[in-house]
């Protein structure tokens, strides 16, 4: 299963915020965009979805930004991926119309595989993903791509 860029970014935002020493300190969208090497507009779109889901809170104002709205140990990764992926089907049987529709065994097999994928990911919480942060040096990595931030 290939995750959408939207989901990938959402997981990275959550991991970054979970690795912060002070969970109460809000992080601005430009800061997250620079650190994670993602377009600021996509960071905003992804963050809005995660605020709506209740995983992040947005603090307005000059010193505002985003911070976790839940405990990392309460946030299961499979639930995050399922919500951000926002699709029920791995294949679209309607476009173009499939001649096997209504009698296809593959669609059921794919649905079971998708559920097994989410179930496996739910064995991990955001707290578990903090292991890939401080101590392993991941939190100290910056974008290695040549990116211009003059538009931020």
Model regions and ranges:
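Non-DNA-binding regulatory cores of transcription-related proteins
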Residues: 69-148
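A short alpha-helical element within helix-turn-helix/winged-helix DNA-binding domains
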Residues: 26-36
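Beta-hairpin "wing" of winged helix-turn-helix
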Residues: 55-63, 67
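Short alpha-helical segments that sit at the start of domains
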Residues: 1-13
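Short amphipathic alpha-helical elements of helix-turn-helix/winged-helix folds
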Residues: 12-20, 83
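Conserved small/polar residues in nucleotide/adenosyl-binding loops
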Residues: 150-152
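Basic amphipathic alpha-helical segments that dock to polyanions
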Residues: 47-51
């Amino acid at each position: 299963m290939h995750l959408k860029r939207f989901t990938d970014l959402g997981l990275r935002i959550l991991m970054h915020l979970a690795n912060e020493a002070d969970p109460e300190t809000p992080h601005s969208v430009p800061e997250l965009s620079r650190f994670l090497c993602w377009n600021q507009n996509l960071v905003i779109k992804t963050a809005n979805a995660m605020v709506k889901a209740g995983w992040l809170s947005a603090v307005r104002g000059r010193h505002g930004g985003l911070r976790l709205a839940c405990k990392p140990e309460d946030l299961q990764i499979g639930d995050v991926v399922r919500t951000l992926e926002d699709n029920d089907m791995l294949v679209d049987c309607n476009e173009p119309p499939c001649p096997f529709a209504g009698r296809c065994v593959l669609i059921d097999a794919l649905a079971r595989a998708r559920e097994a994928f989410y179930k496996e990911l739910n064995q991990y919480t955001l707290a578990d993903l903090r292991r890939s942060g401080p101590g392993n040096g991941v939190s100290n990595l910056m974008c290695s791509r040549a990116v211009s931030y003059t538009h931020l």
